[in-house]
Swiss-Prot record:
GTP binds at residues 17-24, 88-92, 142-145. This is Elongation factor G 1. Its main location: cytoplasm. It comes from the Bacteria. Residues 8-291 form the tr-type G domain. It comes from Burkholderia mallei (strain ATCC 23344). GO terms for cellular component: cytoplasm. Catalyzes the GTP-dependent ribosomal translocation step during translation elongation. During this step, the ribosome changes from the pre-translocational (PRE) to the post-translocational (POST) state as the newly formed A-site-bound peptidyl-tRNA and P-site-bound deacylated tRNA move to the P and E sites, respectively. Catalyzes the coordinated movement of the two tRNA molecules, the mRNA and conformational changes in the ribosome. It is found in: Cytoplasm. The lineage of its organism: Bacteria, Pseudomonadati, Pseudomonadota, Betaproteobacteria, Burkholderiales.
């Protein structure tokens, strides 16, 4: 079956923004104008097509990036039909993982900014992620009809805060309630959209007299930026500033955008149906097709470098970038095809797991509606049914020509909570639900706490875990109660305790019990638990020595201070005695346990707490606030450096986990939400005595 749309006319784009910049409304308008969606869904009615999880519709925020295919022939119908695959990405910092994984499979991005709020915190995070994956981008300043709208301030902020070179290709006509349309700086005409047709119809008009001078000033800047694309153009431009043709300007801006040198900038009001149509034209004019992007690199099964070009003639290769559970078809694997062709029913190799699987149905998604298709080709984004083994980040490829594409990296979870099923019936369903959710979301983990037997869930933030618990209830019918975030303390000793004995004797008629062990206990930093048998002359028979060790090992699970596990201790079994009739394994197990408890009390027991390596990326203006806040949390700052590309400062610190609860909220308020942080476990360290006392007292109160 020949290709319907040439790969040069594909655009795989993401629409990214800070929460509330109006990104979902913008996507809705795209679906409307491209004819996919005949009724405009409004976010504030909870009717937006792309926000298809119930929680998203309630909260009015986008959580899951949905993939949608649309077709566009240009605002004036003067382009050959282009196929646009849109990945909608969330704007909340707890869902950064979703943005990260969609950036990995995009060719270009449209950054949506609020005309009043401008470059906000999540905009900075998304920008860094786009830099990491070298994603070319255009900027759309939305909500130009709001009070306080300022297009040119946002243009400056992109330069100052993001170190991006924003090149306006439009300027607004009017602002706030007088916002009417835009001046197209390439055509040097004003575009006015018709309200009656919801912006489907528009007219080109002369530039309003009061804007002519400003339009010429910004056109000059745009043409100069275009001229820098090549020596020839620059020479032509320097000879005569008006000599560049419309086609030359567009081609030059396109070249520089794809090289990540400039960011073309547009504006509008998605809600008022103005500007989105021209933004779609800019997606076609300036963002790359899969053919404009370098070949994707990977390695074969022998670890030799390999690459795939975006062509149907190359062997099939694709990356699974998202897993979702669909109520009708079960598990959906979203994947991006980088090369080759695959049909439903074909056998694929999951090169990451080295397992072959048959590809069942292939679905093209429009938000949460689906259309079955027979095949996918290089550049396509689709969802597959029937792949049991695939997880996020896996490479799918031709079994005859294996390749493993660069793996996605996912951050470690930073917050944990205990979760308990409310009823026995919920118990079984909860395990299944949590495993399914963990499969969908690599930044969410599930484990069982050996000490308490509780199920512990870990994720990227409090909102993240809240939504997981909510999804368990809605999608799997599991009612669960959630505990407070917890810290896993440990206990150890500071000094040596020698000749400590444990004697377990029970002799009251009949067969008695007799076990007697003498031990030496010492610190064993960083080496865990060790047991040394130093018995001489058979004072304890050989067969009873493992029982002493077993008794101590059981006692390690609950220390003498607050019942936390004991780590990093060395025990020497030095002496003891036995009774020919009454000694048995159980008696020596008890003797070992008693000796260890007593030795621990004598060897100055201390509490250990987990220390976290914390990295904070912050704009320079907030350095003082960030450092002060870390110090107040018993943090030790270990270094600072400039972020590449001038994006502020990176602060490295070591902070106790116990002090990090509520940190994301506190960091947001200390930096107006413009800083982000990551945190991972580093090692255990001794807890200061005042903190240690509070923990021990709380534990004793808890035991009642």
């Amino acid at each position: 079956m020949p290709r319907k749309t040439p790969i040069e006319r594909y655009r795989n784009i993401g629409i990214s923004a800070h929460i509330d910049a109006g990104k979902t409304t913008t996507t809705e308008r795209i679906l409307f104008y491209t004819g996919v969606s005949h009724k405009i869904g409004e976010v504030h009615d909870g009717a937006a097509t792309m926000d298809w999880m119930e929680q998203e519709q309630e909260r009015g925020i986008t959580i899951t990036s949905a993939a949608t295919t649309a077709f566009w022939k240009g605002m004036a119908g003067n382009y050959p039909e282009h196929r646009i695959n849109i990945i909608d990405t969330p704007g909340h910092v707890d869902f950064t993982i979703e943005v990260e994984r969609s950036m990995r499979v995009l060719d270009g991005a449209c950054m949506v900014y609020d005309s009043v709020g401008g470059v906000q915190p999540q905009s900075e995070t998304v920008w860094r992620q786009a830099n990491k994956y070298k994603v070319p981008r255009i900027a759309f300043v939305n909500k130009m009809d709001r009070v306080g709208a300022d297009f040119f301030r946002v243009q400056r902020q992109i330069g100052e805060r993001l170190k991006g070179v924003a090149v306006p290709i439009q300027i607004p006509v009017g602002a706030e309630e007088h916002f009417q349309g835009v001046v197209d700086l390439v055509k040097m005409k004003a575009i006015v959209w018709d309200d009656e047709s919801q912006g489907v119809k528009f007219t080109y008009e002369d530039i309003p007299a009061n804007l002519v001078e400003l339009a010429h000033e910004w056109r000059e800047k745009m043409v100069e930026a275009a001229a820098e694309a090549s020596e020839e153009l620059l020479e032509k431009y320097l000879t005569d500033h008006n000599s560049l043709t419309e086609d030359e300007i567009k081609a030059a801006l396109r070249k520089r955008t794809i090289a990540n040198e400039i960011v073309p900038m547009l504006c509008g009001s998605a809600f008022k149906n103005k500007g989105v149509q021209a933004m779609l034209d800019a997606v076609i004019d300036y963002l790359p097709s899969p053919a404009d992007v370098p070949a994707i690199l990977g390695h074969d099964l022998d670890d030799k470098e390999a690459e795939r070009h975006p062509s149907d003639d190359e062997p099939f290769s694709a990356l699974a970038f998202k897993i979702m559970t669909d109520p009708f078809v079960g598990q959906l694997i979203f994947f991006r095809v980088y090369s080759g062709v695959v049909e439903s029913g074909d056998t694929l190799l999951n090169a990451t797991k080295d397992k072959k699987e048959r590809l069942g149905r292939i679905l093209q998604m429009h938000a949460n509606e689906r259309k079955e298709i027979k095949e996918v080709r290089a550049g396509d984004i689709a969802a597959a049914v029937g792949l049991k083994e695939a997880t996020t980040g896996d490479t799918l490829c031709d079994p005859g020509k294996p390749i493993i594409l660069e793996k996605m990296e996912f951050p470690e979870p930073v917050i944990s909570q205990a979760v308990e099923p409310k009823t026995k019936a919920d118990q079984e369903k909860m395990g299944l639900a949590l495993n399914r959710l963990a499969q969908e979301d690599p930044s969410f983990r599930v484990q069982t706490d050996e000490e308490s037997g509780q199920t512990i869930i870990s994720g990227m933030g409090e909102l993240h875990l809240e939504i997981i618990v909510d999804r368990m209830k809605r999608e799997f019918g599991v009612e669960a109660t959630v505990g407070k975030p917890q810290v896993a303390y440990r206990e150890t000793v500071r000094t040596v305790a020698e000749d400590v004995e444990g004697k377990f004797v029970k002799q009251s008629g009949g067969r008695g019990q007799y076990g007697h062990a003498v031990i030496k206990l010492e610190p064993n930093p960083g080496k865990g638990y060790e047991f040394l048998d130093e018995i001489k002359g058979g004072v304890i028979p050989r067969e009873f020595i493992p029982a002493v060790n077993k008794g101590i090992e059981e006692t390690l699970k609950s220390g003498v201070l607050a019942g936390y596990p004991v780590v990093d201790v060395k025990v020497h079994l030095t002496f003891g005695s036995y009774h020919d009739v009454d000694s048995n394994e159980n008696a020596f197990r008890m003797a070992g346990s008693m000796a260890f408890k007593e030795a621990m009390r004598r060897a100055k027991p201390v509490l250990l707490e987990p220390m976290m390596a914390v990295e904070v990326e912050t704009p320079e203006d907030f350095m003082g606030n960030v450092m002060g806040d870390l110090s107040s949390r018993r943090g030790i700052v270990q270094g600072m450096e400039d972020i590449a590309g001038g994006g502020g400062k990176l602060v490295r610190a070591e902070v106790p986990l116990a002090e990090m609860f509520g940190y994301s909220t506190s960091l947001r308020s200390a930096t107006q939400g413009r800083a982000t942080y990551t945190m991972e476990f580093k090692h255990y360290a001794e807890t200061p005595s005042n903190v240690s006392e509070a923990v021990i007292n709380a534990k004793q109160v808890g035991r009642g």
